[in-house]
Amino acid sequence: MRNVTLILDDGSRFSGKSFGYEKPVAGEVVFNTAMTGYPESLTDPSYAGQLMTLTYPLVGNYGVPPFTIEPNGLATFMESEKIHAEAIIVSDYSYEYSHWNAVESLGEWLKREQVPGITGIDTRELTKILREHGVMMGKIVFDNPIDNGQLTIDNYAAVNYVDRVSCKEIISYLPDGTSRSFPLTMPIAQLNCQLSTVNCQLKKVLLVDCGVKTNIIRCLLKRNVEVIRVPWDYDFNGLEFDGLFISNGPGDPDTCDAAVQNIRKAM
């Protein structure tokens, strides 16, 4: 394991060991208090661009489930199709894992996804700093200066992370586990016609995808509705729907002016 250091914007330094992919990264440092669910948290699009600190001391003891896709295109055990967090920071990483559904260790998964992981960090002290001063920018650097290059800490709020994680097409999900995709260039009138051909009895919920988790879509489908998922900046005015759902997501909402304008017109 290589030595690695987390450096915060205020100059605070935390030394640890690497157990994931070895590359320097920078991002907004945040903490997560969940006792379990690191596969779901890491694949949550809301964590895009962030260095995730887990406050629960022991992490990795139940490994990582397989990545499988359901017939409707949703990930079975994850919140999206890939890891979105820039890195994971833990106090004590367990190299041994045991779970009926595990196929690999957390460290192996991180290396395959090219995401750094740090263990041996005093996450209690780090969390106290973040709690008192609020989230702040930070960077992870390795013991070899050559590896770190010209790593700089950008302004997290200046990057439109929502645009990076939002869907790139219109997707219709049905309660029966099927889905259909439509190009963004399809005229609204034609799209309305296509959407009404399957089951006109179902209520339609329009989902503005600002970084939605798969579990949110599943919860909506359990209400026996059709979910129409559109990109964050898609002008959905003219589409026929019965309910409007705006998902959460990463980054600063100020970068999502197009979504605000579309929602304002709809309201």
Where do the language-model regions lie?
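Short amphipathic alpha-helix with an adjacent loop that forms part of the alpha/beta core around
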Residues: 234-240
